[in-house]
Amino acid sequence: MNELALRGKRILIVEDNALVAKFFRMALERAGGGECILSEDVPTILHHAASGELDLVLLDVSLTNSEWEGRAINGVELCRMVKEKSPRRLPVLLATAHAMSGDRERFLETSGADGCLEKPVYDSAILVEKVRSLMDLA
């Protein structure tokens, strides 16, 4: 994908750390001007997924503030719900600070996500490249 690959793309960022969410948004917008939507609200997230208008979801594995039907929900479970609600193939990139051996593989296997990004992310180019590579597959 070229430098304009994110132009006109809609990316939903689900991240409960405001600083990390801002970093993700700025990095992706600078990489081509795509529209980044921030949300931690599960009904809003599922509405966006069902709309068919998203091009990618960047989803934190360890959500601490998200609830669904009166109970806490994590990013792995939310990923499955997003995939189920989307009317078309919707790439999901999980973001996680869990770096123990096998964590990423387990998250990918149990969530149905398309990729995993290890946090903290110090280089925005790594984030942008992961997003672009998943959009190439869509």
Task: Map each language-model feature to its residues.
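Alpha4 helix (beta4-alpha4-beta5 surface) of REC/receiver domains from two-component response regulators
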Residues: E69-I73, E77, L90, A99-L117
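Hydrophobic/aromatic residues positioned on beta-strands within the core alpha/beta folds
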Residues: A95-T96
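Two-component/phosphorelay signaling modules centered on CheY-like receiver
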Residues: A18-I37, V42-P43
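C-terminal output helix
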Residues: T44, P120-V131
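Short, flexible coil/linker segments at domain boundaries that flank nucleotide/cofactor-interacting
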Residues: L4-G8, P87
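Conserved acidic carboxylate
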Residues: E15
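Acidic, metal-coordinating helix/loop segments flanking the phosphotransfer/catalytic sites
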Residues: L38-S66
